[in-house]
Structures are given as structure tokens and as C-alpha cells.
Amino acid sequence: MKKCVYFLFLVIFVNYNVINASEKISLISLNDIKIIFSTDAKTWNQNLVFLDKKLSMKKLQLDNNSNYSLKTTFSNGYVVITPYFKLDLVESLNINYYFNSINKKNTDSVINHFQSLDKDLCNYIKIDKNDIFIDIKNC
């Protein structure tokens, strides 16, 4: 139950920060990433069913994943958070930021933030048109 409450606060926090991204991009914290990595598939899916009722949040079922993804919209685009599970544990976390109008400030903020995370996390960052893709794994 405690994990569910933390997870709910995490999602609300991410949603709040992404909505305010038009002025300043506030990105998911290291602590929030660690919470996601400690969440099992069942808990993740149960929480997203509940959060799907929020106006700015939507659960998605991607073709290549049996678990849900979380899509949160903000004024300049959206973010999709997708954990990939192996044996019911998060093996990798995919975060996709899409900006309606992307600029150097947006890309630099995202890249610098994710490159400065914990040394125990390995990141792969790819920029393609208006998307910034971040894949995170435990090293």
C-alpha cells in the first residue's frame, strides 16, 4: 500500500512539472525513477487504471509491451513513460518527450538532466524531430 501511495504522488508530481514545462522544464527525479524501478508489473498496471480517469493522463497499451504506458499531456506536447518488465521487475524505463515546438533549450535541459543521473543508471538518449527518447537501465 505504501508503494501505491508513493507511486500516486510520483505520477502527480511528474504531471504537475510537465504541465509547467512551458516556462521551465522540470524532469522526473532520480528518486522517482528508483520508485518506478522498484514497482512490479501488477502494481504499475493497477495504478494506471486508476490514473486513466485524470484529464491530463491516459493509459496506453503499446503493441510491443504487455503492460500499460502512462501518457501525460502538457501545454507544449506530452510525455510517455513505459517500463519494460522482465520476471515482474522493471528491466528498463523508456521516457518519450514530444514537444509541439522543440528548441535547443528543451533538448539541452532534457539531455543534461538525464546525463547527470546516478552512476548506477545507464542512459541512451536519442532526438528525432520533435521527440526526445530516453532509455534507462540499471548498470
Region annotations inferred by a language model:
Residues 123-129:
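Short, exposed beta-strand-loop hairpins at the edges of beta-sheets
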Residues 1-23:
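Classical Sec-dependent N-terminal signal peptides that target proteins to the secretory pathway
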Residues 132-139:
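Short, low-complexity, Pro/Ser/Thr/Gly-rich segments in the mature regions of secreted, periplasmic
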Residues 88, 130-132:
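Beta-strand-connecting loop/turn residues
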Residues 17-123:
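Short helix/turn-capping signatures at newly exposed starts of structured segments
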